[in-house]
Amino acid sequence: MQIAPRLPCKSGAVSITTPRVFDFNLLLTNIFGRNSKSVPRRSAKPVDRHTITVCRPAGGTVDRRLLMNATLPAHLLAMERRAVPAEMIAALKIRFAERCSTAQAVREQHGRDESPFEVAPPDAVVFAESTEEVAEVLVLADRYAVPVIAFGVGSSLEGHLLAVQGGISIDVSRMNRVLRINDEDLTVTVQPGVTRNQLNNEIRHTGLFFPIDPGADASLGGMAATRASGTNAVRYGTMRENVLALQVVTATGEVIRTGTRAKKSSAGYDLTRLMVGSEGTLGIITEVTVKLYPQPESVSAAICHFPSIDAAVKTTIQIIQLGVPIARCELLDANAVRAVNLHDKLSLREAPMLLMEFHGSAASVAEQAQVVQDVAREHGGENFEWATTPEERTRLWTARHRAYFAGMSSHPGCRTVTTDTCVPISRLAECIDLAVREADEAGLPYYIVGHVGDGNFHIAYLIDPAKPEQRETAERLNEQLVHHALKLEGTCTGEHGIGLHKQGFLIDETGLATVQMMRVLKRALDPKNILNPGKIFAL
């Protein structure tokens, strides 16, 4: 998207070149606000790529950094920052003392995540240490109609943490206690700032583990809020299947509980599932109860190289269709392997590779491994290498989890535009083939990693921030890939969430009527639109 100022409009104008089909009225609503009488209207018929000039009504301010970094029409939402009254900041400082900061460095730290967007930071940061303190901040925010954004470790890839309307960032990283381990029931309750590595370290003595492992050492609160998954999802599922209950602070500061530790319930609406994946727009999660699993008797990992990405993907599809209960099945293309070798000082063969792991009894693991080897050989797989010791497995999986940063370090100074499509397993080969051909034709550097066992893969396009044409190319490729995935009955995001980046795709995937229903829920639970405004969709 190209945005530049125009002169004829007294209150300031913005020229926007759109790179995709979109609803003209929805875009204008996002820019002017729903109640502006000066907004020109036209039919809701979608319009194709063109340039329009719109005038911002007097009395509002536009965050130019958001405009200049926007890449899709939907990102022009929530550009007007809300004023945070001085008396609210003063009240927070009196209540939280040094745990309420307006220092520029602290605000900047909480105004960035791993997404490529740059917007102004929040007006203040509060380091909360309890559910009651989160509720106190929200009571004040409700009184003054000030936005609030929850912050865990800052690993979002989709702009979830960005204060697009200003406001207060609530840092919950100090809420990092494991509250209750119920090993007989295979559950644990934690505060939102507990990270996955911390949790597994603290419960290791029980013989149990928590399997969900996104690439970053993310917080459990953030993982629940984005409905995250990871390399183990093919066997253990995602956060959607593994969260049993939540404690949530609402927009008015009320504390509610959803769900129980029981394995099933038919009691009323399933508010737990509503909150899981809501990206902090319906409430702030302050406790999470999740399932645990017995540590497997035997674990073995292997890598296998293939002559092509297509051969690796077809191997994966056959493994899943045969019902092999594989625990992990990860794809790295040659570019990703090369980057990992450089970053982690490994010497893996630089060819498309599957990295797999098997859990179970010794006999079961041996049987699974034999079936997988036979299938891989049918598709040209070779050089099966086994990692049987914990140290060898840890080294391989650490390298896999670092692939994102390894890819970036291979092109110093670059940023990434990362895809997150997920398709039915039977359509995976077709989707990846289309993506690879289009990426090769475009000429941008890229690498591919994927949780291909459940149909989810990521292409990271590496771009020079100083070259807007590269950003535009990457977004065009991302858009094309999403549309391919949707035609194949897949989704625009398997695990990263919508955030700022994928809002236009949400309408493409679900339809406008479905998004309107989501808006109805949002307005009912957050009538002042103070909970992480501007994410998922515009109001």
Please provide the spans of the model-predicted regions:
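C-terminal substrate-recognition/cap domain of FAD-linked oxidoreductases
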Residues: S101-R112, Y293-P294, S300, H305-Q480, ...
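Activity-critical C-terminal alpha-helical subdomain
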Residues: E254, Q503-L539
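Intrinsic-disorder-associated, low-complexity terminal segments enriched in Asp/Asn/His/Tyr and depleted
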Residues: D23-N25, N30, N35, D48-H50, ...
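Intrinsically disordered, low-complexity segments enriched in small polar residues
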Residues: S11-S15, G33
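FAD-binding subdomain of flavoenzyme oxidoreductases
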Residues: R177-E330, L531
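Intrinsic low-complexity, disordered N-terminal segments enriched in polar/charged/small residues
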Residues: M1, V14-I16, L27, H50-T51
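N-terminal flexible segment immediately upstream of the FAD-binding catalytic core
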Residues: D63, L67-V139, S155-L186, A336-D344, ...
